[in-house]
Amino acid sequence: MLKCTIKNEQIETLRSGDTFVSYEIETESDLPVFEDKKFSVRRRYKDFEMLHNILSHDYNGYAIPPLPRKYTVSSFSGGSLSPIFIARRMQSLQTFLDRCSTHPVISNSMHMYQFLENNSWKSYYHNAWMQSENTKSKGNNVSGGIESSIQNLDPYAQSLYETAKQLLQNADTDLSKLEKTCVQYMNSVQNFPTDIPVPSNLSISNLDVVSVEFKRLKRNSIFLINSFHSKVITSIQDLEDYMVVFKSLIKSREQKVKQFEHFQQIVQSNSNNPDQSSRSDPNFVEATPVVQQTPELKPSPNTTIRTSSLFSIPKFFKKKRYSLGQDDANPMELLQLSFQELCIFNEKLEQELNFLRERIDVEMRKTLQMVCDCHVEYFSGILEQHAVKE
């Protein structure tokens, strides 16, 4: 169990006079990696950026949750220190942590643990980055055993690819409709009239009472709009930003397929014309039909994701004996490496799609609950004002 809660925002001032907002992150967990079951640290936005950077660097091929949008602070009275801006950022940072803490791979990352607990987070970040770079530069030869993987996996996995595109398309459509509906509703609330036509038979005293009630409703409507912005609209936009991350994964897969097909054409050409390239692999003639006959990779809802420790860099495609862009590399070797990269990418894409489905369900339910909560607060405020008046 790993539960993170952001609370107690605080405006702090540096010696230089610069101000920033820090947030308390309270963590509850029964994981043995933590000394305490409940603890807290204070973090600012730059610390979240560091976490996002190191996760993106070490967990390539995974859909790392995006950071909150950098809203145009000029649209908020008070800029980045305005209550509305801080509320929206807190909401998005909470969503970011929720996604990370429930992700089957990221939630087991030492980077995540250190972010939540280490008081010297900045120092840890720089050391971890340097160690990651050193491990990456050493490389690792993973070209062995590729023939056996070719017999078991289909690099194209067309059904997985189509499923991913359809899921993202449907999510985009639903989110756009929901956001449009919310904006229209907020506009109708914002245009709530303050003046009303006065019937000829209405006394001045009654008119004053009605006018006061309308002004009171207008004030409550402003609170409702602000609450909608900081909670509901922000939640929808955070989901839209998450979709962008998955779209980039789809584009990356398309590029890898093209790369695989490019090397496949080169090897086939060399096999058909062996005199044109002394470096062609003689075994490719036997390997090629196997690729075409392998069964298609089907998405499975019960995929188990393997985790990685901090210093075994969990990059899905480490440096190899041959670089895919190296001119003097063996074409067959490049084809095999490209094939392996694509197969591993397919596996991770399937895992990420399963997680995305769960997050869409959880976050949409949470958004609808926010809509209800906003209106409960709105009508409760009106009733409380009437109670005080009486």
Swiss-Prot record:
Residues 1-123 form the PX domain. A 1,2-diacyl-sn-glycero-3-phospho-(1D-myo-inositol-3-phosphate) binds at R44, K70, R89. It is found in: Cytoplasm; Membrane. GO terms for biological process: endocytic recycling; mitophagy; piecemeal microautophagy of the nucleus; protein transport; reticulophagy. One of its GO terms (cellular component) is early endosome. Keywords: Coiled coil, Cytoplasm, Lipid-binding, Membrane, Protein transport, Transport. It is a peripheral membrane protein. It comes from the Eukaryota. Pfam families: PX. GO terms for molecular function: phosphatidylinositol-3-phosphate binding. The keyword tRNA-binding does not apply. PANTHER family: SORTING NEXIN-4. The PX domain binds phosphatidylinositol 3-phosphate which is necessary for peripheral membrane localization to the perivacuolar punctate structures. Belongs to the sorting nexin family. This is Sorting nexin C1711.11. It comes from Schizosaccharomyces pombe (strain 972 / ATCC 24843). The lineage of its organism: Eukaryota, Fungi, Dikarya, Ascomycota, Taphrinomycotina.
